[in-house]
Amino acid sequence: MDYSKYKSSGRYYTGAERKKGILIQGEPYIVKYAKNSPQGLTCSYLSEYIGSHLFRIAGIEAQETFLGKCDGLPVVVMKDFIGGDEIFVPFNDVGDSTLEQSRERYKYTYEDIMLMLEENMKLTNVEETVRHFWDMYLIDAW
C-alpha cells in the first residue's frame, strides 16, 4: 500500500527514525520510515511490525501495524495511540526528569528503571505500569 496519498495529520514525532502523521479516514496514524545507515536502509520498520504481532500473539495489547511505502520508501504504519488529552513522553525524557545523571554517560540499571517508574509523578497507575514493563521486557527478550 502506498501511504503517500494521505494528508498530514499535523502531528509530529521524535525518535531515532523519521516519522510523520497522516490521516486515514479521519483517524491519525504514524508513518515510520526505514532508517538510512552506511550499509543502506535498516530493517527497523520490519522489527516494529513483527514485534507488535508477537506481542499480540502473546496476549499483550500492542499497536496494529501495517507495512507499505511512503514517498518511495518502505514504512511501517500504526494507528496513533495518543489520545486527544494525552502527551507522549519518551522513556529517556522520563529518566532525564527523574535521575540526576546525564543520559549520554549513564546506562540505566533495572533498579534505576523501577525507581523511575515508582517515583514518577506523571504516571497514574504505577503498579500496572511496572507489571506491563516486565511483560514487555520478557516478550522483547524472547
PLM-predicted stretches and their roles:
Residues D80-A141:
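ATP-dependent phospho-/nucleotidyl transfer catalytic cores
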Residues F55, A141-W142:
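Short strand-loop-helix active-site module centered on a catalytic nucleophile
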